[in-house]
Amino acid sequence: GAPCNLTWREAGERERLWVTSRQHPIAQGLPDHFELETEEMYGEPFGVPEPLETVFISWFQGGEVFRSGLTYRRRAGNICYFRPGHETYPTYHDATVQKVISNAVKWAYNPATRIANPNDAPNTSIDIALEPLVERGPRLHHAGEKGFR
């Protein structure tokens, strides 16, 4: 994983979020920028993998900037990182923040067929191995017994 290291400050400062990817579905219906009057500051550098897209960049009253809206894809999943929000401040009551979260949920949804049983871990026989195989060593499971459940 990534260290996710960053600088931060709890000072209730103003945050201005700029939309940097106007055509992204997460930014649909949003103004070019919006402000949150009291927020916790996060500052660069931010130790995360390079995102697929950066949808928002924040500027804070103290002068710091931060990549506040990042997207990733992992296997069949879409992931959105959205920075604003602190237990001390009323961030989630802001209508624009609520719109971002709603858009992000819609964007992240993947209607593809789900894995029927994500805990299914079949114990396959050496008889169906691609190469000839001789069983060696102790066994934890009996032939045909399922593994992780």
Stretches with model-predicted labels:
Residues Q61-R67, R73-R149:
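Extracellular ligand-binding/catalytic regions of CAZymes and related secreted enzymes
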Residues A2-A76, E135:
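Catalytic beta-strand/loop cores that center a nucleophilic Ser/Cys/Thr
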